[in-house]
Design a protein with these regions (language model features):
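Phosphate-binding loop of NTP-binding sites
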Residues: 1-110, 117, 128-134, 151
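Gly/charged, well-structured mid-domain segments that form the phosphate/adenylate-handling core
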Residues: 133-152
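Hydrophobic alpha-helical transmembrane segments
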Residues: 120-123
Length: 152
């Protein structure tokens, strides 16, 4: 994601860096731990998890530390987001950041989407909001988007 090596765990597309993972869904807590270990061994700096019933079983994130939660529904409060993810065993602590799309992330995503010829930039905007919440500077995000565009 934006220049950092990441893993993705989602029922629609799980991968460790560039390698696709063949997993049986929904994942249990042990499955999540095993998959995250594979991602770490491959050199992933972070793992993006889809928090939905198709991907995860109840309490599948019991021993997982979550730094950033993102929700595409900007109408939800932080407390409502925390309640929604609690069924997966995800504890929202003082260090957890809850991110949602913002005007800033929408603008950056729209600029990048135009360069790629895409019309929908919502998922990119949410990704940008997540890395902003994680503490990545806006200049670094712009640079990563530029490099990504140049590589494509």
């Amino acid at each position: 994601m934006l220049g950092n090596p990441v893993g993705v765990i989602s029922s629609s597309d799980s991968q460790s860096l560039e390698r696709f993972l063949n997993l049986g869904y929904p994942l249990s807590a042990i499955d999540v731990q095993r998959t995250m270990a594979v991602c770490a061994e491959d050199g992933a700096a972070a793992v993006i998890l889809a928090l939905d019933e198709e991907t995860l079983r109840k309490d599948a994130l019991q021993s997982v530390s979550v730094d950033v939660l993102a929700c595409d529904d900007n109408g939800l409060s932080d407390a409502e987001v925390a309640k929604l993810v609690a069924k997966f065993g995800c504890a929202v602590g003082k260090q957890t950041r809850i991110a949602g799309r913002t005007q800033e992330s929408d603008l950056l995503a729209a600029q990048a989407a135009t360069a790629y010829g895409q019309t929908d930039s919502r998922s990119l905007s949410l990704s940008i909001a997540m890395v902003l919440a994680a503490g990545v500077r806006k200049a670094n995000i712009k640079s990563a988007l530029r490099v990504s565009r140049d590589l494509n």
